[in-house]
Curated annotation (Swiss-Prot):
HAMAP family: Cytb6_f_subIV. This is Cytochrome b6-f complex subunit 4. InterPro entries: Cyt_b/b6_C, Cyt_b/b6_C_sf, Cyt_b6/f_cplx_suIV, Cytochrome_b_C_euk/bac. PANTHER family: CYTOCHROME B. It comes from Rippkaea orientalis (strain PCC 8801 / RF-1). GO terms for cellular component: plasma membrane-derived thylakoid membrane. One of its GO terms (biological process) is photosynthetic electron transport chain. The keyword Secreted does not apply. Its main location: membrane. Component of the cytochrome b6-f complex, which mediates electron transfer between photosystem II (PSII) and photosystem I (PSI), cyclic electron flow around PSI, and state transitions. It is found in: Cellular thylakoid membrane. The keyword Acetylation does not apply.
Length: 160
C-alpha cells in the first residue's frame, strides 16, 4: 500500500500550474520505475512459480495409457478437429470435403465486403455479420457433436 502525498492547495506555484492544466495525475506513485521494475516482475515470476508448482504437485493426465494390443474401433481426432473430421466423414467425395473446408475461410473473408456499407461495430446493427456468425457457430457445434456419434447417427445426433 502506497502513501500518497497530498497537495498543498494554498501554494501559489501549484495554483499557477493547476491553472495551466496540470491535473490530478501529477501526484501519486509513478509507473516507472516503481511498477515496471519491481511489481510486474514479482507478479510474473509468482505466476510462473504457481503454475510450475501446480504442474509438479498435481500433473494432469493426458488420457488413458496407450495399449498397443487393443486398437479402438474408431479413432477420433482431438476435440477441436471434430467439425473438420465430420465434414470429411459425411461427404461421399473426399475432394468435395476438402473444397468445403476451403470454402469456409473464403466465405468468412467475403463477409466484410458484403456488409461494407454498414460501418457500425455494434453486432445488433450489423445483421448480416451477426447472422453469419450465429449460423457458423450452430453448424460448427452440430458437426462437432455429430463427430462423436457413429456414422449412421451423426447427422441427426441420434435424435431422429
Amino acid at each position: 500500500m502506497s502513501i500518497q502525498k497530498k497537495p498543498d492547495l494554498s501554494d501559489p506555484k501549484l495554483r499557477a500550474k493547476l491553472a495551466q492544466g496540470m491535473g490530478h495525475n501529477y501526484y501519486g506513485e509513478p509507473a516507472w520505475p516503481n511498477d515496471l521494475l519491481y511489481v510486474f516482475p514479482v507478479v510474473i515470476l509468482g505466476t510462473i512459480g504457481l503454475v510450475t508448482a501446480l504442474a509438479v504437485l498435481d500433473p494432469a493426465l493426458v488420457g488413458e495409457p496407450a495399449d498397443p494390443f487393443a486398437t479402438p474401433l474408431e479413432i477420433l481426432p482431438e476435440w477441436y478437429l471434430y467439425p473438420v473430421f465430420q465434414i470429411l466423414r459425411i461427404l461421399p467425395n473426399k475432394l468435395l470435403g476438402i473444397a468445403c473446408q476451403a470454402a469456409i475461410p473464403l466465405g468468412l473473408m467475403l463477409v466484410p465486403f458484403i456488409e461494407s456499407v454498414n460501418k457500425f461495430q455494434n453486432p445488433f446493427r450489423r445483421p448480416v455479420a451477426t447472422a453469419v456468425f450465429l449460423f457458423g457457430t450452430v453448424v460448427t457445434l452440430w458437426l462437432g457433436a455429430g463427430a462423436t456419434f457413429p456414422i449412421d447417427k451423426s447427422l441427426t445426433l441420434g435424435l431422429f
